[in-house]
Structures are given as C-alpha cells and as structure tokens.
UniProtKB/Swiss-Prot annotation:
It comes from Arabidopsis thaliana (Mouse-ear cress). CDD domains: PIN_Rrp44-like. The keyword RNA-binding applies. PANTHER family: EXOSOME COMPLEX EXONUCLEASE RRP44, RIBONUCLEASE. This is Exosome complex exonuclease RRP44 homolog A.
Length: 933
C-alpha cells in the first residue's frame, strides 16, 4: 500500500518548503509476542502476559528505570525511537542497546510503516500531538490484535495523552503507578522527578499555587533567545565551571572575542558545567574584577582540595582565583566582561557519582526520605533526591541522575540510579573515577569478541607470500617501553649502511590487519577512542587477545607490522623515506631502564647495544634540531608509585624520571608521525586525520609572564622559538628552578587536538609545541583509535587498500575527530584522578613534612607545588572565608602576600616547609591537608 507523507521543512535560507514523501505500508510486520497466533514467532521477543507500550517522554526521562532488569516485555514504537533520536542521542543509544540485547525483552515495532498503525498527520496538528496519536493507535492495535492472550498497557506521564487514551478504550497508567504495581518499592527510587506536564500521584498539589520564594530568574523561551542572538543582545557558548571554584564559570564568546565570566550560582541560573547557554552581558559598571568575587552566600567554601599538578590551561586554576586587593591603585585588577545566563539551549546532564550528605535517619522506616546528594565533581551542585533506602546508602558511593531544576529550588532534583560500593574502598573509588570521566569499562560483547582470530595465532604462509608485505625478520628489531608493558605498539631497528649512512626503522603493530571497518570490533574501538591507564588498572580500547598477544610486538615471536623506514646521514638528515607493511621478529623487549643501562655500560659491545647507541646519537641530533626550530621542552609532574603486590596499596611515591632512552624512543616516534602526516596529506588533502596544537594567546600566557616579572625574569613569548630560548635562559639559584618554570609554562598551553584536514586551512595545521607544520598519530594503534584511522589512510595512500567510505563523509570525519578529542581528554582526566586517589591512600598512614614551592598567591594564602610528589594544593594563612582581611594583603605586581605590619611575606616560587596529612573534616570525606610549618 502506498501513502503520501506531507510535511514542512525549513531551508537554510529560512524559507518553509512543503515536502512530499511516498510511504510504502506493509502487512508483514509482526507484533513480537510469543502468545500471538497470527504472527511469525521466529522474531518474537515478548513472552509475558502483560506487555507495556512506552511513550517518548517515558523513554527520555525514565531510561534509568527501563534499564533495570525488573522492567521487561516492552514495546518501543518506531515513532518513539525517531523522536528520542532527535531529542537526546545519548538516551537513544541506550534504548537501542536495550532493544538489541538478547537477554532483555524490548521489541521495536515499526508502527510508521504498518498498514494498520500508520497515522497520517491532520491539518494544523502539531508534531507532538501527531506522535501521541500514533502511539495511541499502535497501542489500541496491540490490544485488539492480541485480544485475551496478553494485557497491553500504555505507560505515559503525559496527562492529556492518558486522558485521550482512556476515552479511546486504551488501558493506560502513569510510570509511577505501573512501578508501584510491581511490588518492588526500591524501584521507585529510580523514577525521575515529574516535570510540569507530567502526572504526579498527588495531582491535587498541582492546582495549589506555590508560596515558595523564587530563587532564580525564569529562562527565556527559545524564540526570544534566537532573536536575541541574532540582534547581538545574547551570546551563545558552552558554560565551563572553574574546577577550583564551583561558583565561577566561563562562557567563550566569539562575538566579543573573549570569555564572559559568570560569578555566583544566581548568575549561572541553574546551568550545569557543559551546558550550551545564552548569556546576557551585565552593565559595564557591574563588571567585576577578580577581587570582587564573593562566595559567602553559599554554604560551601572555595575548593581546598589537593590536586595533581595541572598539565595544561584547562586543568589549571583560573587567574581570577587571585585576589588583586593591594595597598595602591596601581595594582588594581582589570575588569572582565561579566554576565548572567538567561537560558539553556542544550543540557549536558548525565549521571553523577558521589554520596549522600551525612544526616540523621528519620523516625520510622520504610518511608520516603529526602536527601542531598554531593557529587565527587565539585563543579556540580548538590542534588535533591527521594529514597526509600536511606539507611543503606549513607556510607555508599552512588550514582544519581538529574531530572529538573525548578526556579524555586536552590538545588536541582534528581533520582537515585544505583550503588557503586563503600566509600573509601579502593575498587569503589576507582570505579567512580571511570564513571565520572565517562570511560566505558564494560566487558567486550560477544559480537566484538567474535571478530578476533582464534588463538593461538601466528604469522601464516599467506602473510609471508603477500606481495604488499615485506619480510623483515632478518633485521635486529627491538622494543623499548615502560617496565611490565604488555601492549607493545612499537619496535625499532638501526642498521649501518655501506655508504656510511644508517637505515632506521620504526615498526608499528599492524592493528588494521585485524580491525576491519564497519565490524563490531571497529565500532567498539571507535566509541572507546583510547585505552585508559590508571595506577593499578588498564581499560583497553581493544580486547586483550589483540593488545597483549596477536598485535603486541613481543620478543622472539613473529608479528605483522606497518613500518616507516628512513635512510639517514650520520648527522640525522633524512635521505629517503619509505612505508611498507612488514613481518618482523623482535629480538628483545627492553624497559627504558634496561636500554639506558646497556648504553651506559662501556663494557658492552654487542650488536643490540651498538644499535641503541647509534640510535641515541642520531636522536640527540634530531632533538636539538627540533629545539632549534622552536620546539618547546616543557615539563610536567608525572608521578609513579611502587605498589604492594599483595594488597595493591602504594608503598612509595615519587616523580617519574625521564632517561635518555625515553627521549630516544620519543624522537623516532615523533619523526614517524611527521613522515606519515606528510604522506597521507599529499594523497588525501581534504580527509586526513591530523593533530594540531594551537598557539597560546597572550591572555593564556599572562600567569606565566606575571610570575616571571615578579622574580625579575623576562620571557619572550612572541613565538615558540622565542619562548623556548627564554626558558633555556631561565636559570635560578637551585637546580629545580628551571623545571618549575617549564611546568608553569606547560599549564598555560591548551591541549593538542585531532582534526580533519578539510576543516581548516594549512596554516592552522601547525603544532606549536613541536614546531611542526604537520603532525599526526600513527605509532600507537593498539591504544589509540586515531592511529587506526591513520593506518587506513596510509595503506590507501600506498594502494594497499581502498579508502573506507567514512573518509568521503566530511561531517562524520569531524564527528570522529571530536569524539577522539573527548575520549583522549577524559582518559587523561581519569588517569590524573586515579593518581590523586592513590596519593590520598598513600598519605592516610604517612603524615610527613616536605619542601614545597609557592606557585600562586591567593588572598588568604597561597598555592604550593610539592616537587617530590607532583601535587599542589592550598596553604592558608588566615581562616577560610576571611579572604585575607586584616592581617595580610596581596602585592599583585610583586606576586607576594605580605603581613600588614611588614614583618612577614611569601613570594611566588619561594621555598616553604609544609606538613602533609590526611584529615576528615566531614564523615567519609577524607582530604589531604597542607599546613605551613
């Protein structure tokens, strides 16, 4: 049967066009119920005598409940799936996963193309009303189709939809009533709080006008926001809450060319970190400098948590954490554009990890208790939840989702999702780290594992005879990695040539020989984006049979590789470059320490040691050449732990030491990545995946320049070369001074990012930190999906494979790059959070005194960096909340905090002695406290 579907579509130019689509209606779409006598049961999923049909809002708002195994035999209509897909892609992915899970009875019914359930839109009928009518028609069809064999129930919280369903003879209930009928009270905790359009179980309350005080301004409607954006009254951007001060946020604005600062929760107006918001600038006389920020209106105080030292500008405290209150006007802080949120364009709500605020148990038991949830992420406000399990949850880490935030409520409302484990338990806190950073740590599915070759695997005769694969097993190949490394991506070789030159080879695991485009394995790797390295755990991007065996370039086994081979002169000039698929057999899997020991031991003259020394000599020349071009030699506070093999607690902690062997391997990996970038861009100028490092703005470098000026140091930041030279000249009285300056420079930089070459102009491809016009990632395909992508590009450039179709879809390529950046960032944050967790565990039983360096002056003290442990945190000179009033003042120009009588002062980069100890100011909330000695 053929039907015409008519709808209006808005063009890019803003005009409305009538669209007509032909719809073919079918009579061979089955209901999916085993009890049905007229439909083919081979595709049936629904076995219960009670089947529920859910509407769009139930799926959108109650997905946490639907994922609970107590909810089953659910019909998800195609019209519901389409609307969910348009409104919330994350929820759409979750409901699709439920529908495809063979262990769950969720059945997708294509009502939009079934001859008996197709619904033609009526004139002047809204899209929402049309969808609701389609849901009712499909539910009524199910009722009549199944008759007495199954009870069919429409579950909806839409008051009007439920009323019409009842009038039309359809059985309908609210989600709350349905859950109560199941006789499992704990499921009620999973219910999202109702919105204004929803039905509550106490409808009488809806008619009573609220007498509660309005705390927040009403959000503007989207029509007004859109008009305001066009007129330049409002500014759109992503709200980013300061990680070190949850009452201060920033919205980047292209229209005014700088960030708009949002001070205080009232001006944030119920916006969450990551929300896309519309911001209105405050009158200029209300723009504030940093010293004007007050958080006295809130119960909470400014963040005083000890953190791992930041690695880039995104992690570092904002300069506005400084007070510029001084004894003279010459040091007054400049005002910054300040604004307030007038509307939320797109929410970034997701599930959050944390615990309930300590409270006494209410009298009686079994009833509903109201509790405040405190997220581990301090950027997130407290969340109100109702729970019937309060006694069991008070000492637990739990997951909570946000449902709404009313103007009359100081805090958002949400619902309990699930427990994680006991507060303070190492496994629990590690799982919190993974959830908070959106790291997928679920086991690989059977569909993914089915893509793997059977074990044991070995190089086949077909691999050896493959004309595109060169046999390099005769070469002395070796790998150099951290100790205990099992997922070995890369190996090297260095051979002296008769003409006095060297042949250098970088051999990378040939992951794409096993991970094919469009397979479940490839889809899973693409979603995960990267492996995640925690202190005592690794979350793999690919299944372990690949990462630790089939692809890993282990010693004394033959493996498939993708090789970059250069001929180099003795002064490390590249004479020629070639790329080839290869077969190698690694002779040794060395640790950095082992490789360094070989190079340093003059008694060793074997071939492997000689090759290492030759490579190291060439690497030093290459490194110096990069530095001469302007590459930055920055520093970060990498921390390493010695772990107890029995209880897995940290035994010792210290800064990671970089050896020449580390730098040698890094140099050849960089060179391989640069060579591959040039090759793929030459052949595929519009669809290559590259990596760029944006040049830092003067504003981003301002904290470094202020610190340098305060200690009499002049830094030239006009180019990466000028900055590199300035950093080389920054030599202080102690040997750690230069490294500290480099650490401060590092945190002024943004992160490097992946991008599609067709999205930017060639000058924007530049990698600032490496001083390289072109760069990509090729050398770690076991642990980074970006490298898998680049391997496919390189293979296609050599004519080995055809370029996969994804490379012809620019928007999809951009989406892939965005996801890779998101996953890479989250992996880094998870790694840092894991280190911070183990630092806390280490100091629980080891209070200690240690030297620290002042890195930032605040109004009531200063931030110190502890070099031995790579951590930083606040040291208070006055009581928290006093903001330095009375006893101390800040000299902004000299970057020091001075006692009013002049008897004592502390300056930036000064060495101080501190005491480090874990304290517990609130139950179950331990923190590392730093105090001045």
């Amino acid at each position: 049967m053929l039907q015409s579907k008519v709808f209006n579509k808005k063009t890019r130019g803003g005009r409305i066009q009538k669209q007509v689509r032909e719809v073919y209606l079918r009579d061979d779409i089955y209901c999916g119920a085993f009890s049905c006598k007229s439909c083919d049961s081979s595709a049936a999923r629904l076995s219960s005598s009670k089947i529920i049909v859910v509407d769009t809002n139930v799926v959108l708002h109650q997905i946490d409940l639907l994922e609970n195994k107590a909810i089953d035999t659910v019909v998800v209509l195609s019209v519901v799936l389409d609307e969910v897909k348009n409104r919330n892609r994350s929820v759409y992915n979750r409901i699709r996963l439920l529908c495809s899970n063979p262990a769950r009875q969720f059945y997708v019914f294509s009502n939009h193309v079934h001859k008996d359930t197709y619904v033609q839109a009526m004139e002047k009928e809204s899209a929402n009303d049309h969808n609701d009518r389609a849901i009712r028609v499909a539910t009524l069809w199910y009722q009549k189709h199944l008759g007495d064999t199954s009870q069919v129930l429409l579950v909806t919280n839409d008051r009007e939809n439920k009323r019409k369903a009842t009038e039309e003879g359809i059985s309908a209930e609210t989600i709350e009533a349905y859950v109560k009928s199941l006789g499992q009270p704990e499921l009620l905790d999973l219910l999202a709080q109702p919105t204004n359009e929803d039905i509550t179980m106490e409808d009488a309350d809806d008619s009573r006008p609220s007498k509660r005080k309005l705390i927040y301004q009403e959000h503007k409607p989207m029509s007004e926001i859109t008009a305001g954006l066009h007129r330049g009254i409002y500014h759109q951007g992503k709200l980013r809450v300061n990680r070190f001060n949850p009452y201060e946020a920033y919205v980047g604005s292209e229209s005014i060319g700088e960030e708009i600062i949002i001070y205080g929760r009232s001006n944030m107006n119920r916006a969450f970190d990551g929300d896309i918001v519309a911001v209105e600038l405050l009158p200029r006389d209300q723009w504030q400098d940093e010293k004007a920020l007050s958080i006295a209106e809130e119960d909470d105080e400014e963040d005083d948590t000890v953190h791992l030292a930041p690695d880039n500008v995104d992690d570092a405290p904002r300069t506005s954490n400084l007070s510029h209150e001084t004894s003279g006007d010459k040091n007054a802080a400049p005002v910054r554009p300040s604004g307030r949120v007038v509307g939320v364009i797109r929410r970034n709500w997701h599930s959050y990890c944390g615990s309930l605020e300590p409270m006494s148990l209410p009298a009686g038991s079994g009833g509903t208790a109201h509790a405040l949830f405190v997220s581990k992420d301090r950027r997130i406000p407290k969340i109100r939840i109702n729970t019937r399990q309060l006694q069991n949850l008070l000492d637990m880490r739990i997951v909570v989702a946000v449902d709404s935030w009313d103007r009359q409520s100081r805090y958002p409302s949400g619902h309990y999702v699930r427990p994680i484990g006991k507060i303070g338990d190492k496994e629990t806190e590690t799982e919190v780290v993974l959830i908070e950073n959106d790291v997928d740590y679920s086991p690989f599915s059977s569909q993914v594992l089915a893509c793997l070759p059977p074990l044991p695997w070995s190089v086949s005769s077909e691999d050896v005879s493959n004309p595109v694969r060169q046999d390099l097993r005769h070469l002395l190949v070796f790998s150099v990695d951290p100790p205990g490394c099992k997922d070995i991506d890369d190996a090297l070789h260095c051979t002296s040539l008769p003409n006095g030159n060297f042949e250098l080879g970088v051999h990378i695991a040939d992951v794409t020989n096993f991970v094919h485009p469009g397979t479940p394995l490839d889809d899973e790797a693409s979603k995960r984006g990267t492996s995640v390295y925690l202190v005592e755990r690794r979350i793999d991007m690919l299944p372990k049979p690949l990462t630790e065996d089939i692809c890993s370039l282990r010693a004394d086994v033959e493996r498939l590789a993708f090789s970059v081979i250069w001929e180099m002169s003795p002064d490390a000039e590249i004479i020629s470059t070639r790329f080839t698929k290869s077969i190698i057999k690694s002779s040794a899997a060395l640790s950095y320490i082992e490789a360094q020991a070989r190079m340093d031991d003059s008694r060793l003259t074997d071939s492997l040691t000689t090759d290492l020394r030759n490579m190291n000599t060439l690497a030093k020349i290459m490194r110096q050449r990069r530095i001469d071009r302007g590459a930055l030699t920055l520093a970060s506070a990498e921390v390493k732990f010695d772990i107890d093999p029995e209880n897995h607690d940290p035994l010792n902690i210290g800064m990671y030491q970089i050896l020449e062997a580390n730098q040698m391997v890094e140099e050849f990996m960089l060179a391989a990545n640069v060579s591959v970038a040039g090759q793929i861009l030459k052949l595929f100028p519009s669809c290559s995946l590259l990596r760029r490092h944006p040049t830092p703005t003067r504003e981003m470098l301002e904290p470094l320049l202020r610190t340098a000026a305060a200690i009499g140091l002049t830094l030239d930041v006009s180019s990466s070369k000028a900055l590199a030279d300035s950093l080389d000249r920054a030599v202080g009285e102690d040997p750690y001074f230069n490294k500290l300056i480099r650490i401060l420079a590092t945190r002024c930089m943004t992160q490097a990012v992946y991008f599609c070459s067709g999205d930017l102009s060639p000058p924007e491809y530049h990698h600032y930190g490496l001083a390289a016009p072109l760069y990509t990632h090729f050398t770690s395909p076991i642990r980074r999906y970006a490298d898998v992508f680049v391997h496919r590009l390189l293979a296609a450039s050599l004519g080995i494979y055809k370029l996969p179709t994804v490379f012809q879809d620019r928007p999809q390529l951009t989406s892939v790059a965005d996801n890779l950046n998101y996953r890479h960032r989250n992996a880094q944050m998870a790694g840092r959070a894991s280190v911070e967790l183990y630092v806390l565990i280490y100091f629980r039983t080891r209070p200690t005194d240690e030297e620290a360096r002042v890195v930032k002056i605040r109004s009531n003290g200063f931030i110190v960096f502890v070099p031995k442990y790579g951590i930083e945190g606040p040291v208070y000179l006055t009581g928290k909340g006093e903001k330095g009033a009375g006893d101390w003042y800040v000299d902004e120009e000299k970057q020091k905090i001075v006692k009013m009588d002049g008897s004592l002062s502390y300056s930036v980069l000064q060495t101080v002695k501190i005491h480090m100890e874990v304290v517990e100011p609130q139950p179950n909330r331990p923190k590392l406290q730093l105090t001045l000695l």
